[in-house]
From Swiss-Prot:
Keyword Magnesium: yes
CDD domains linked: RNase_HII_bacteria_HIII_like (cd06590), RNAse_HIII_N (cd14796)
Entry's family note: Belongs to the RNase HII family. RnhC subfamily.
Pfam short name (any one): DUF3378
GO molecular function: magnesium ion binding; RNA binding; RNA-DNA hybrid ribonuclease activity
Cofactors, names only: Mn(2+); Mg(2+)
Catalytic activity: Endonucleolytic cleavage to 5'-phosphomonoester
Origin species: Leuconostoc citreum (strain KM20)
Record's protein name: Ribonuclease HIII
Gene this protein is translated from: rnhC
Matches recorded under InterPro entries: RNase_HII/HIII (IPR001352), RNase_HII/HIII_dom (IPR024567), RNase_HIII (IPR004641), RNase_HIII_N (IPR024568), RNaseH-like_sf (IPR012337), RNaseH_sf (IPR036397), TBP_dom_sf (IPR012295)
GO biological-process terms attached to the record: DNA replication, removal of RNA primer; mismatch repair
Ranges where the RNase H type-2 domain occurs: 93-308
NCBIfam families: rnhC
């Protein structure tokens, strides 16, 4: 089962950064990268064609389909449709939404936030102008985040590099995401008890069965599974996910400022060449990358090669 998308070169660069944690060292001729996830393999070519294969190909392709031309090839006539499982009128429900940032960035944390937006707060949240949180500037998010924090029940899991690096050898990136989402959701449920939300919406990064398998494997307790929905582009289906996305992003930005201050230099976001150069500089200065970066990224080896 597979699908091929045609994307622009700028979009291809974004995808390369996003999949950097999953990249393998060997790629076929003409390929920019090959990323192996638990349920899918993504192969991107210099031509802008990106091949998604495996049982989770739909979920992975859905992340990028809005910014791609029509698929050039599809198997089993499967169409990737974000939100296909979301009930009618879901946007008007009382929902806890969760989202994460930082998984594709070498420096900085993996940050996950969950926010409860009740029916009574929907109009207030709409007035903040966060419906399409992905288009907001960092400055605008910084303005909005304090209002969300003050009014809406929320919880943020900010997995700093040292903790991330301690956990990562025993948990793949998606498993760390699942653990963080589940913990954040549990904390918000505790805060709003005895109120129960109509639903929980997780911005999807894995198939539902895979997500719950991750939590079982990690022996998480309790596992939040009642009325849980998954979809990519979750912010388009409920404002709670948009609010969570903003909180996660602002906490990530604040953490990057703090880490940059400790490093004595600006730590770039992403996983490109600029990141390699800064990591190499940190090594030359005798600073510990474990404190600043996700060490399993290919950037670590690249930085060391620049030093040697």
């Amino acid at each position: 089962m597979q699908i091929v998308l045609q994307v622009s070169i700028p979009q291809l660069k974004k995808m390369a950064a996003y999949y950097a944690p999953y990249a393998v060292s060997k790629a076929p001729k003409g390929a920019v990268f090959v990323a192996k996830l638990s349920q899918a393999t993504v192969t991107a070519y210099k031509s802008g064609k990106v091949l998604f294969q495996g049982s989770g190909f739909k979920v992975e392709a859905a992340r990028w389909q809005d910014n791609a031309n029509q698929p050039t090839q599809k198997m089993n006539a499967s169409h990737v449709t974000p939100g296909a499982t979301i009930p009618t009128d879901f946007a008007n429900w009382s929902v806890i939404g969760s989202d994460e940032v930082g998984a594709g960035a070498y420096f900085g944390p993996l940050t996950t936030a969950a926010v409860f937006v009740s029916k009574n707060d929907l109009d207030w949240v709409k007035a903040l102008g966060i419906a399409d949180s992905k288009t907001l500037t960092d400055a605008k998010m910084r303005d909005i985040a304090p209002e969300i924090i003050q009014r809406l029940p929320h919880h943020v899991v900010n997995l700093l590099p040292e903790k991330y690096n301690a956990l990562q050898p025993h948990n793949n990136v998606n498993q760390l995401k699942a653990i963080s989402h589940n913990f954040a959701l549990h904390k918000v449920l505790e805060k709003i008890a005895p109120i129960t939300p109509d639903a929980i919406l997780i911005d999807q990064f894995a198939q539902a069965t895979t997500y719950f398998n991750y939590l079982s494997k990690a022996q998480q307790s309790p596992v939040i599974r009642q009325n849980v929905y998954f979809t990519t582009k979750g912010e388009q289906y409920h404002l709670s996910v948009a609010a969570a996305s903003i909180l996660a992003r602002v906490v990530e930005l604040d953490t990057m400022v703090a880490l940059s201050h400790e490093a004595g230099m600006t730590l770039p976001i992403g996983a490109g060449k600029a990141v390699d150069l800064v990591a190499a500089k940190l090594i030359r200065q005798g600073q510990d990358l474990n404190h600043f970066a996700k060490l399993h990224f290919a950037n670590t080896a690249k930085a060391k090669s620049l030093v040697n």
